[in-house]
């Protein structure tokens, strides 16, 4: 288990103070997006307790229970249960804790999420057979997707997608999903991200009818499957901005695949960003997403994820 997890007990008065803090947080009250979490902020520990039912005294017991459930289910011989056991046999307790947190310490539901995690990889092997830093680096450098280097005021990791310059002939939809999968795996190593979750901003300014026509239903379904029950991630909000009128046609293809919980977290703003700015501060957003920072730089983010790129290294697909 990560050493960053808190080991102190809080009395009710302290808990009330921390709950009050949670209502007034800014982006500066959270840890870094990239790299491990050295120590969870006290208010984040309180959030885990309140929202995820996490308790120090039951954390290890829950992990052990999930590990035992994996083995017990595999003993039945059911194909997916066996695949789950094989996939996790060398994983540490921190890996299991991600799934338990994502399902609010309900071990049975955490196991179902683990099944979904493995099944997604079996169902779409094309996303994982060549998944490596070298395979996805140039896609991430191009900004598909982007990741802000600062968390939002809720402590969430903010992922970006700007569709205007996307050419499917140059970067395929599967290559974009590969990059999403790699980033999710990487950033979920951070415990603060496990607890606070993700927010996704999709800028559809410049979305053309040709792009809309090129999006296959099977690709859109694959994207939705990635967001639902396939990662130990809390997707807290998906914001669409600057979408044209014909975006509705694409969205109507996706909506039947969305479960009610995720559908309630989708916000379609158009060009009126007043409600959007109530949730996402302008001062953490790049200018191409309506913020005050310089234009998004995918190469800088790739260096945060992978380190500097050697000149001789070939990261093309």
Curated annotation (Swiss-Prot):
GO cellular component: a single term: nucleoplasm
Residues with the N-acetylserine modification: 2
Ranges where the CRAL-TRIO domain occurs: 136-297
- Cite the entry's keywords alphabetically: Acetylation, Cytoplasm, Disease variant, Retinol-binding, Sensory transduction, Transport, Vision
In this chain, 11-cis-retinal is annotated as bound at 180, 202
Q: Which molecular-function annotation in GO is an example for this chain?
A: retinol binding
| Coiled-coil stretches | none
Q: Where in the cell is it found?
A: Cytoplasm
Q: Which residues cross the membrane?
A: none
Pfam families assigned to the protein according to its UniProt record, in alphabetical order: CRAL_TRIO, CRAL_TRIO_N
Q: In which tissues is it expressed?
A: Retina and pineal gland. Not present in photoreceptor cells but is expressed abundantly in the adjacent retinal pigment epithelium (RPE) and in the Mueller glial cells of the retina.
> What's a single GO BP term from this record?
visual perception
Q: Can you state the subunit structure given in the record? A: Interacts with DEGS1; the interaction increases synthesis of chromophore-precursors by DEGS1.
Q: Which disease is it linked to?
A: Bothnia retinal dystrophy: A type of retinitis punctata albescens. Affected individuals show night blindness from early childhood with features consistent with retinitis punctata albescens and macular degeneration. Rod-cone dystrophy Newfoundland: A rod-cone dystrophy reminiscent of retinitis punctata albescens but with a substantially lower age at onset and more-rapid and distinctive progression. Rod-cone dystrophies results from initial loss of rod photoreceptors, later followed by cone photoreceptors loss.
Per its record, how is this protein called by name?
Retinaldehyde-binding protein 1
**Source organism per UniProt:** Homo sapiens
């Amino acid at each position: 288990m990560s050493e960053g997890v808190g080991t102190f007990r809080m009395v009710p008065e302290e808990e009330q103070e921390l709950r009050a803090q949670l209502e007034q947080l800014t982006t500066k009250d959270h840890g870094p997006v990239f790299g491990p979490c050295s120590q969870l902020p006290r208010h984040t520990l309180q959030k885990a307790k309140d929202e995820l039912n996490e308790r120090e005294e039951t954390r290890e017991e829950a992990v052990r229970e999930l590990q035992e459930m994996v083995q017990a289910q595999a003993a039945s011989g059911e194909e997916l249960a066996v695949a789950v056991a094989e996939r996790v046999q060398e994983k540490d307790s921190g890996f299991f804790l991600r799934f338990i947190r994502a399902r609010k310490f309900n071990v049975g539901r955490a196991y179902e999420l683990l099944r979904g995690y493995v099944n997604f990889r079996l169902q779409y092997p094309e996303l994982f057979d060549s998944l490596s830093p070298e395979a996805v680096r140039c896609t991430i450098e191009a900004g598909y997707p982007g990741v802000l280097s600062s968390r939002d005021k809720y402590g969430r990791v903010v992922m970006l997608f700007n569709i205007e310059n996307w050419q499917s002939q140059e970067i395929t939809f599967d290559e974009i999903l590969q990059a999403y999968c790699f980033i999710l795996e990487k950033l979920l190593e951070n415990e603060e991200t496990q607890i606070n979750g993700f927010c996704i901003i999709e800028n559809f300014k410049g979305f053309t009818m040709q792009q809309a026509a090129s999006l296959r239903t099977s690709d859109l379904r694959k994207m939705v499957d990635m967001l639902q029950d396939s990662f130990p991630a809390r997707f807290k909000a998906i914001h669409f901005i600057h979408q044209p009128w014909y975006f509705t046609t694409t969205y109507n293809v996706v909506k039947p695949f969305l479960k009610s919980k995720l559908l309630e977290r989708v916000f379609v703003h158009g060009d009126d960003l007043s409600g959007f700015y109530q949730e996402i501060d302008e001062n953490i957003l790049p200018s191409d997403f309506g913020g005050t920072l310089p234009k998004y730089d995918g190469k800088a983010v790739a260096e945060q994820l992978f380190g500097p790129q050697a000149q001789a290294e070939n990261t093309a697909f």
